Amino acid sequence: MSDNKEDSTVDNSNSTEEVPLPTRFEVELEFVQSLANIPYVTYLLTQQQLLWKDPKFKNYLKYLEYWCEPPYAQCIVYPNALFILKLLNGFMEKATVNEDGLLDGLEDLPKVIQLQGNQWMNEMVERWAN
C-alpha cells in the first residue's frame, strides 16, 4: 500500500493569529493560587533579587487581598493560598523601609515559611478531607 493519505492535521505555524495574552484577572488568580505551593513561596523569599523586600511587592500583596472576598474567593481552587497571602501580609505590615529602600524586619519570614510550610499544607489537606 502506498502512503498517499492526506494529513488531516492543520499546520498553524504560518498562522497570523496571535494567542491572546492572559487577562489581569487570570494572571493575578494564577499568582495568588501559586502561594499555596510552599516550595514556590520559599523560592520567592530566598531568591537573590530580594523581590520580597521591595515595598512595591508589599503593596502588590496587600492589593491582592481582594481575592479573599466574594465573588473572587470562589475562583480560588487552593484556599490555603489565601492563608499564605494573609500570613505574608501580616509579616509585611510590621516591616519598615530602610535607607536603601528595602523592607526591614522580614529576616525571619523565609525561616518561618520553610519550617512551618509542610505543617500548613498538612492542615490544609485535613481541612479538605473533613
UniProtKB/Swiss-Prot annotation:
GO terms for biological process: DNA repair; meiotic gene conversion; positive regulation of transcription elongation by RNA polymerase II; positive regulation of transcription initiation by RNA polymerase II; RNA polymerase II preinitiation complex assembly. It is found in: Nucleus. GO terms for molecular function: transcription coactivator activity. Gene3D superfamilies: Mediator of RNA polymerase II, submodule Med31 (Soh1). Keywords: Activator, Nucleus, Transcription, Transcription regulation. One of its GO terms (cellular component) is mediator complex. InterPro entries: Med31_sf (IPR038089), Mediator_Med31 (IPR008831). It holds the Pfam family Med31. Its main location: nucleus. Component of the Mediator complex, a coactivator involved in the regulated transcription of nearly all RNA polymerase II-dependent genes. Mediator functions as a bridge to convey information from gene-specific regulatory proteins to the basal RNA polymerase II transcription machinery. Mediator is recruited to promoters by direct interactions with regulatory proteins and serves as a scaffold for the assembly of a functional preinitiation complex with RNA polymerase II and the general transcription factors. Belongs to the Mediator complex subunit 31 family. Component of the Mediator complex. This is Mediator of RNA polymerase II transcription subunit 31. The lineage of its organism: Eukaryota, Fungi, Dikarya, Ascomycota, Saccharomycotina.
